[in-house]
């Protein structure tokens, strides 16, 4: 019975669990809005609160010139429109226009667009009912004709009519949605008949206030329930069949925070034998059982009810059975079902729940209020629906079914369609009970967790599991031993076993477990199908030595006591001995098939009925345990509080409503109104197809990285990006009128536009289309800050003064003092050591000496304090051990007394220690300084919570940034509490809260970019990602600039024939192509592997001699290495007047300020960085005569050799039409070469004369080929000329121009020009001309892209020499043989000269950091020391970035990946180290190890390959492992569970016949209609071998090749192993193997298995088995196979197709055996902590 009294305190407080709203009829028979609040008090009484008097409202924007007269007229017109609409469409007697009870003009700010705090005119409309509010809003959604006010229909903008009234009530009263409410007891009116709760009150809405104590949880009641049904056949039960009745309903009751079931009920048909601890109620008929269930819920009054798939099966089955009873009764009486006087549905729904439904119907007229609902109209089509009005408690036709309609004020059955990215399409069918929140655990787990399957047994095994730390066989007593001897040869003998584990949460005594064995790649049962009963669970405490700290520590275990049979115990012993295998236990659901339930129920034996009942109750308990284990309630409460929405919204609504409530609450506080956004129709014009450049993702670089790769990560990048530039709707500047106003600063953001498909939109000239957005931010003065934060600053000052007073008066230290002083000195010392270690001017020896000295200094400074601390720590440890070892026989009271006594003794001992040490005045002053620093930090922290600082100016946040600031600050505060909290109960609450803050902050950005969101504002979403990109690039640049030698692994490339200017250490300048800089190519694993079309095998490097330099933006700089790789990419030619270069589309060019710019972002007129070296004019060992001849040869000379039948012939000639010029050359040649020459008349045949040598032709050819030609037969200006005096250079130019100048000297054009073929030739001539002082411009021919025209003059160039004049798409690199090689340089300066002319480009850049840690010999290290240094440098880099990055951005060191396999974009796996080089775990993302649409066999194969590469760094072992598992696979040695795939069944498909699991689901529905798969179910299936007859392969559908696992077993079908190999394994395995092997070798490797299986199916023997290869030498398919190494000559032969060692791994070979350069790598790996995840990848 409800209690009549409450305690004597003044305030009545309870925690809210559920919200509901409905309408009652007032005295005028009009609807009146009512809010219901349900909850529970701290002393465990449930509450129902009827909140009255709240009136829904919304706003309409009205013209600024309107006065009261116009407003009155407008309201009159609006009311008339509503009245007309009601009469036309609704009940004529029900006029909603009368429900408008108040209206008024108000002034508010608009939320959208910056208006400098301007107030606008709005009309506030207040209503009696939410129904009326929606009707008025609906009228205003369309243009309204207001005669007398406007000449034509106008659209009046609505504001906040889309905020639900009870949400707005929550905002106004500042209530926490599921926190604690507080009401003055004088304001409460008792209405005990209103509900069945302990307390039923009515209260005015203004009197409901928030409690001051919200960090607590009421002892909520949680009901788990499950139904059992029988079937008239062997198929699954179907509710519409008369005999498929509900035979049992189980109920288990738990309290929030407890794992113990305090009450159990089983309602059953037929007699049931008693069950200990269970209330058994037996019924003769199903109707009585259902009536009993309704009464039981009313009696128990739970706050939450939960089941498993209860939204998909249980509630709907109950509803359908009740409906069937009404149908049968109507048929029996011969009346329509609605004519029944006492409908069973009415009885059940009025009985069930907390509210007294009969009272609401009789006293508040709920049955007379019209309800508006949508029903399917089968007369139109199967999908058509219509909107109808009906009274409560009525059945209506809904397609082929009946729908029961009831008022939302009382219990009703609801069918809700919910679509979300997390859940997909869902139809939720459930009984909605006001005050009892319904949760379907299956839907929750589907939303939050990606599992292979969602059957209850799979889910429970997945979550109720733990690693077995050790397993101990317990000794038997003599009696047991004797009996065992007698039964020694039997399998019935069992062994007592204790499984020690960290936690057994959600595991109970008498439940069952399975023992799982993990080989690193997948888990399998110790014995297939074996389950072991849990006989007991005990807590065991052990004292052990921690090997790392060398200290004794207390370890607490949970020991699971079970029994294992002899066969399994032997297997368990062998498993325990194997160090490579891991053991865990999982919950094993004690399942009962529905056919067995049928059988037992038919027998009717009370004991058999009891077995069904026990099974039913176990499922109820299991759901409760899962709810507690996954902390669903506390996490959901945290999220609901943060977002200000009822708890039920988290289970029944999408993401948008949460963020909308959060923002609308803040807007209300700031006097802003949010408009109701109009959705654009498809026919409307607009830019809805335009999107913005999305999130920045690091360009993928697929490879196996052996060097440590450090990763830095911005904290809350997107939320902080919004805060950094004040991105908020009301700050957006869209009108120049409000630009550059005093008192504000302005932020500009540039975004790149994309189309709907994500492609960048471009202008006519090819440059990206951009938009520029601006946001205003208010400046705030110090006076304002001190005024607004006065109370907070006063509190900080008071705390400071009190603490200083305590310090000045205290004689002895406290624990806090000691800790603070130690931390202070450690922080100072750590900072000094860091500065020393990163001081590049110091040698390693000097660094070590200084670090040792600093450590000695630290020991001296803190030695005194450490001595005290050690004594205190020992006292505390002894006390803990003493408390842990208290006798377990003590009851709770005795135990508590003993603990209190021990703790008091500990405090006394600690006081004695401190009493020995007096504080000196110096130490006292030191403590006071620490207090001052703490107070200063507190002041700055409080300011940062409210304001931001931009360039030294304090500014106020806009609404969205302020919300984000509050969320992030609250998360920080909550984490601070969490770190110090000891109570696990409170810790769970705090952890849920901090997680909710984080998720909500990240979700806010997403809502601004979601078109369906009421907060949609695409500019904010676009600007957020743009700022994020800026921050990432800034971080990258900071690292590059501050860490010399750090390598960046995002490669840019130029073509191989690109000219490069180099300088030898002796000063000689040379011009060569970039491809000729490299020699002795070897693998370069970290370069250029990111490209989509890049062949990862051809990434190579060549170390460049240290005696040469390249010209760069910073002068001459060392070349670290030359890099090349093959790719298939677009090549762009970028031409300025003084520079021309061919680059890949992603190459980084530089602007004059050395900012990076990509070719695709350039346009005509863009200025680029140019620079040119001073010429080297030193050599004079060539005569001017010879230089003239050389120049002539460069212009029109030729030489070479050719094969004839008589042998090799040589030719050398100078060619020209001018005999005078040739005679001049003849004279000079005969003087310098001492050879006779002659002129041949070849005018008729060649139109030129030829000057040729009479003898020594071979000598002339060899000499000129050597100095004039590169390896591609392009002519060069000899380096002797490039470095000679100006006179010699002028002679060379004179000779060249005489031979090939396009204009003669006699032509008076003011300039000269020449055309030359080839980049290298053009650049040589360009350099020559520049060194002679000419201004040279470059042009190109569109018809012949290898011809360059150089125009030179002494006059000043008229046009901007560094501005782009042409951008030309040349072509793609070749598609043949994996593409062409493209090249790059790594230089110390980060840039280099390239191409024809003076252009300087950027070399490689990236976000991933490789610091290239080297040993004393300059060799790169990849060992533990390299890892430690990488971690340290990353931490240092984070500090440097944070010194200059705009607030509130902050970057942190996140992790180091070592080694690291990057497969593709967002697909990687590696060993992740954080701060310790001794602790790591496997980190993976997007790879097959965790994808649900891959069978477990894929994880076994690919996981093993990864394991051997990452842990063992052994390619051969990876190959050998692959062979072993593929042999086992094709021989059928793996169990079927390794081949099960599962996919989600969606509601619609374009071509359902092509969707395999949809076809299977349809087959399953035909075979067993009652067990028909539901929308969003995971459908498990296996590919089977199936004879498809004469069907062509292309005509075979996937759905024909799969079957459900149970069907496969029942029908003894064969698994198609070949399908798994070809379609699931080969692709992901090849992606990794091809990082280290030739593609063709990988193909051969897998083809062997494919051919063998195909032959086997045809009945043919495989070729490999037919032939005897036993005597042939063994070969590995791996490029790194272990094979004898012969002579260099033999290795280079190409006479065989044998796989060769990839050059990348040559350096791993030492003394004819493969070893990594880190010789002790394996020892190091084995010495570190074991993988914390047992090689179960952590997926992002």
UniProtKB/Swiss-Prot annotation:
The gene coding this protein: POLB
GO BP annotations, alphabetical order: base-excision repair, gap-filling; DNA replication proofreading; nucleotide-excision repair, DNA gap filling; viral DNA genome replication
Transmembrane stretches, start-end: none
Protein name: DNA polymerase
Biased composition (Polar residues): 1685-1700
UniProt xrefs under Gene3D superfamilies: DNA polymerase family B, C-terminal domain (1.10.132.60), DNA Polymerase, chain B, domain 1 (3.30.342.10), Helix hairpin bin (1.10.287.690), Homing endonucleases (3.10.28.10), Palm domain of DNA polymerase (3.90.1600.10), Ribonuclease H-like superfamily/Ribonuclease H (3.30.420.10)
Pfam family, one: DNA_pol_B_exo1
Organism: Acanthamoeba polyphaga mimivirus (APMV)
Organism superkingdom: Viruses
């Amino acid at each position: 019975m409800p209690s009549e009294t409450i305690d004597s305190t003044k305030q009545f407080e309870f925690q809210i669990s559920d919200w509901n709203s409905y309408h009652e009829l007032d005295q005028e028979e009009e609807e009146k809005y009512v809010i219901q609040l349900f909850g529970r008090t701290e002393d465990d009484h449930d509450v129902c609160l009827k909140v009255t008097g709240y009136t829904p409202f919304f706003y309409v924007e009205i013209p600024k010139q309107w006065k009261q007269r116009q407003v009155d007229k407008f309201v009159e017109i609006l009311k008339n429109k509503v009245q007309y609409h009601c009469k036309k469409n609704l009940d004529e007697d029900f006029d909603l226009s009368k429900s408008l009870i108040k209206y008024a003009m108000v002034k508010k700010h608009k939320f959208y667009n910056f208006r400098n705090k301007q107030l606008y005119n709005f009309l506030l409309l207040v209503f009696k009912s939410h129904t009326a509010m929606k009707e008025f809003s609906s009228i205003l959604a369309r243009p309204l004709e207001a005669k007398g006010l406007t000449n034509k229909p106008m659209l009046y903008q609505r504001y906040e009519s889309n905020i639900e009234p009870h949400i707005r009530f929550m905002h106004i009263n500042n209530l926490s949605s599921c926190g604690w409410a507080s009401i003055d007891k004088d304001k409460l009116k008792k209405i005990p008949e209103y509900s069945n709760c302990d307390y039923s009150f009515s209260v005015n809405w203004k009197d409901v206030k928030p409690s001051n104590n919200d960090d607590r949880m009421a002892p909520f009641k949680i009901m788990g329930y499950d139904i059992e049904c029988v079937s008239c056949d062997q198929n699954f039960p179907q509710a519409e069949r008369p005999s498929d009745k509900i035979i049992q309903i189980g109920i288990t009751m738990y309290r929030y925070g407890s794992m113990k079931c305090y009450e159990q009920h089983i309602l059953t048909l037929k007699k049931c034998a008693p069950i200990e601890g269970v209330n058994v109620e037996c019924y003769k008929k199903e109707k009585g059982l259902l009536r009993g269930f309704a009464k039981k819920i009313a009696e128990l009054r739970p706050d939450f009810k939960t089941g498993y798939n209860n939204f998909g099966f249980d509630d709907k089955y109950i509803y359908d059975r009740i409906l069937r009873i009404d149908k049968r009764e109507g048929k029996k009486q011969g009346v329509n079902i609605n004519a029944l006087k006492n409908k069973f549905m009415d009885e059940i729904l009025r009985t069930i729940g907390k509210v007294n439904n009969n009272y609401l119907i009789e006293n508040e007229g709920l049955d007379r209020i019209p309800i508006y609902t949508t029903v399917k109209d089968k007369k139109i089509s199967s999908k058509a629906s219509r909107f109808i009005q009906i009274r409560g408690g009525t059945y209506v036709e809904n397609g082929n079914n009946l729908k029961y309609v009831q008022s939302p004020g009382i219990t009703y059955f609801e069918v809700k369609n919910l679509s979300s990215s997390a859940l997909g399409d869902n139809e939720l069918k459930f009984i909605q009970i006001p005050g009892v929140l319904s949760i379907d655990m299956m839907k929750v787990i589907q939303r939050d967790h990606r599992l292979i399957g969602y059957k209850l047994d799979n889910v429970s095994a997945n979550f109720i599991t733990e690693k077995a730390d050790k397993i101990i066989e317990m000794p038997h007593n003599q009696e047991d031993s004797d009996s065992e001897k007698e039964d020694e040869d039997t399998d019935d003998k069992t062994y007592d076993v204790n499984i020690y584990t960290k936690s057994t949460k959600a595991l109970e005594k008498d439940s069952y477990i399975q023992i799982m064995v993990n080989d690193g790649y997948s888990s399998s049962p110790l014995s297939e199908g074996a389950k072991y009963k849990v006989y007991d669970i005990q807590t065991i405490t052990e004292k052990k030595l921690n090997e790392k700290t060398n200290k004794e520590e207390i370890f607490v275990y949970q020991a699971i006591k079970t029994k294992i049979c002899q066969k399994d115990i032997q297997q368990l012993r062998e498993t325990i001995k194997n160090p490579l295998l891991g053991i865990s236990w999982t919950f094993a659901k004690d399942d009962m098939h529905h056919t067995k339930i049928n059988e037992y129920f038919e027998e009717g034996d009370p004991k058999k009925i009891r077995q069904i009942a026990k099974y039913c109750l176990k499922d109820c308990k299991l759901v409760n345990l899962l709810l507690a284990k996954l902390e669903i309630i506390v996490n959901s409460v945290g999220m609901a509080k943060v977002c200000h929405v009822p708890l039920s919204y988290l289970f029944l609504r999408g993401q948008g409503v949460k963020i909308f409530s959060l923002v609308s609450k803040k807007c209300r506080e700031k006097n802003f109104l949010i408009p109701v956004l109009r959705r654009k129709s498809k026919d409307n014009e607009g830019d809805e197809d335009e999107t913005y450049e999305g999130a920045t993702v690091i360009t993928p670089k697929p490879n196996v990285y052996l060097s440590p790769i450090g990763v830095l990560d911005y904290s809350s990048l997107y939320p902080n990006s919004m805060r950094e530039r004040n991105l908020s709707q009301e700050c957006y500047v869209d009108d120049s009128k409000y630009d550059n106003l005093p008192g504000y600063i302005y932020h500009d953001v540039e975004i790149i536009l994309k189309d709907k498909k994500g492609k960048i939109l471009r202008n006519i000239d090819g440059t990206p289309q951009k938009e520029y957005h601006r946001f205003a931010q208010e400046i705030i003065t110090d006076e304002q800050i001190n005024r607004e934060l006065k109370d907070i600053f006063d509190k900080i000052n008071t705390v400071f003064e009190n603490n200083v007073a305590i310090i000045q008066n205290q004689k002895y230290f406290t624990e806090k003092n000691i800790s603070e002083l130690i931390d202070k000195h450690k922080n100072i010392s750590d900072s000094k050591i860091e500065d020393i270690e990163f001081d590049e001017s110091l040698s390693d020896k000097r660094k070590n000496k200084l670090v040792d000295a600093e450590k000695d200094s630290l020991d001296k400074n803190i030695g005194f304090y450490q001595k005290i601390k050690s004594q205190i720590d020992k006292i505390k440890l002894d006390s803990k051990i003493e408390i842990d070892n208290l006798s377990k026989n003590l009851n709770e009271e005795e135990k508590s007394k003993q603990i209190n006594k021990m703790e008091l003794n500990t405090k006394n001992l600690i006081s004695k220690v401190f009493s020995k040490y007096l504080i000196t005045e110096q130490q006292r002053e030191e403590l006071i300084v620490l207090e001052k620093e703490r107070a200063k930090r507190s002041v700055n922290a409080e300011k940062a919570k409210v304001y931001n600082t931009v360039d030294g100016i304090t500014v106020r946040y806009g609404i969205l940034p302020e919300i984000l600031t509050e969320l992030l600050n609250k998360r920080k505060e909550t984490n601070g509490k969490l770190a110090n909290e000891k109570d696990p109960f409170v810790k769970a609450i705090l952890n849920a809260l901090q997680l909710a803050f984080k998720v909500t902050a990240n979700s806010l950005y997403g809502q601004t970019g979601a078109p369906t969101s009421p907060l949609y504002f695409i500019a904010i979403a676009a600007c957020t990602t743009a700022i994020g990109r800026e921050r990432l690039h800034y971080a990258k640049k900071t690292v590059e600039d501050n860490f010399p030698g750090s390598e960046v692994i995002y490669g840019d490339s130029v073509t191989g024939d690109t000219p490069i200017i180099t300088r030898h250490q002796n000063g000689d300048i040379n011009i060569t192509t970039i491809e000729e800089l490299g020699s002795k190519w070897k693998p370069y694993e970290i370069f250029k592997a990111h490209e989509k079309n890049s062949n990862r095998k051809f990434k190579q490097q060549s170390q460049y001699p240290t005696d040469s330099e390249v010209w760069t933006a910073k002068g001459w700089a060392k070349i670290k290495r030359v890099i090349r790789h093959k790719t298939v990419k677009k090549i762009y030619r970028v031409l300025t007047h003084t520079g021309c270069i061919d680059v890949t589309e992603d190459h980084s060019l530089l602007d004059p300020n050395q900012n990076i710019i990509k070719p695709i972002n350039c346009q005509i007129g863009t200025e680029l960085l140019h620079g040119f070296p001073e010429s080297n004019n030193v050599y004079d060992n060539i005569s001017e005569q010879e230089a003239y001849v050389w120049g002539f040869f460069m212009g029109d000379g030729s030489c070479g050799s050719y094969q004839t039948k008589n042998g090799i012939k040589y030719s050398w000639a100078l060619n020209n039409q001018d005999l005078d010029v040739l005679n001049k050359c003849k004279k000079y040649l005969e003087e310098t070469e001492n050879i006779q020459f002659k002129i041949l008349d070849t005018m008729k045949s060649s139109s030129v004369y030829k000057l040729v040598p009479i003898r020594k032709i071979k000598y002339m050819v060899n000499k000129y080929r050597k100095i004039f030609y590169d390896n591609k037969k392009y002519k060069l200006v000899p380096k002797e000329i490039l470095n000679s005096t100006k006179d010699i250079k002028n002679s060379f130019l004179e000779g060249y121009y005489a031979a090939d100048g396009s204009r003669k000297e006699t032509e008076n054009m003011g300039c000269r020009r020449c055309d030359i073929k080839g980049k290298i030739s053009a650049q040589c001539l360009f350099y020559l001309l520049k060194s002679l002082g000419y201004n040279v411009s470059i042009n190109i021919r569109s018809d012949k892209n290898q011809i360059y025209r150089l125009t030179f003059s002494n006059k000043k160039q008229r046009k901007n020499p560094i501005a782009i004049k042409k951008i030309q798409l040349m072509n793609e690199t070749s598609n043949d043989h994996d593409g062409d090689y493209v090249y790059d340089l790594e230089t110390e300066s980060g840039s280099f000269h390239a191409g024809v002319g003076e252009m300087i480009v950027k070399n490689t850049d990236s976000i991933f950091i490789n610091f290239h840690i080297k040993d004393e010999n300059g060799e790169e290290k990849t060992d533990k020391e390299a890892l430690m240094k990488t971690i340290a440098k990353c931490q240092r880099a984070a500090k440097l970035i944070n010194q200059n990055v705009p607030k509130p951005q902050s970057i942190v060191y996140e992790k180091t990946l070592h080694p690291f396999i990057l497969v593709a974009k967002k697909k990687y796996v590696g060993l992740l180290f954080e701060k310790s080089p001794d602790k790591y775990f496997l980190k993976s993302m997007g790879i097959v190890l965790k994808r649900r649409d891959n069978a477990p066999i894929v994880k076994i194969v690919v996981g093993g390959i990864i394991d051997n590469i990452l842990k063992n760094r052994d390619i051969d072992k990876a190959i050998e492992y692959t062979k072993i598992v593929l042999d086992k696979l094709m021989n059928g040695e793996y169990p079927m569970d390794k081949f099960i795939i599962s996919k989600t069944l969606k509601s619609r498909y374009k071509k359902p016949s092509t969707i395999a699991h949809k076809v299977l689901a349809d087959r399953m529905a035909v075979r067993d209609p009652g067990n028909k798969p539901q929308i969003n179910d995971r459908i498990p299936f296996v590919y089977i071998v199936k004879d498809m007859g004469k069907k062509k392969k292309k005509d075979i559908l996937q759905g024909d090749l799969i079957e459900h696992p149970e069907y496969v077993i029942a029908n003894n079908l064969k698994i198609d192993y070949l399908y798994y190999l070809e379609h699931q394994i080969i692709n992901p395995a090849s992606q990794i193997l091809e990082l280290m092997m030739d593609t063709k070798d990988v193909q051969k490797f897998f083809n062997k298995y494919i051919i063998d299986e195909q032959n086997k199916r045809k009945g043919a023997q495989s070729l490999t088995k037919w032939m005897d290869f036993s005597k042939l030498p063994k070969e590995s398919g791996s490029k790194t196979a272990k094979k004898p190494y012969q002579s260099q000559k033999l290795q280079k032969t190409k006479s065989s197709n044998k796989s060769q060692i990839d050059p990348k791994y040559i350096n791993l070979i030492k003394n004819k055996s493969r070893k990594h350069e880190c010789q002790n790598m394996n020892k190091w790996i084995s010495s570190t902590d074991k993988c914390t995840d047992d090689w179960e990848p952590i997926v992002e």
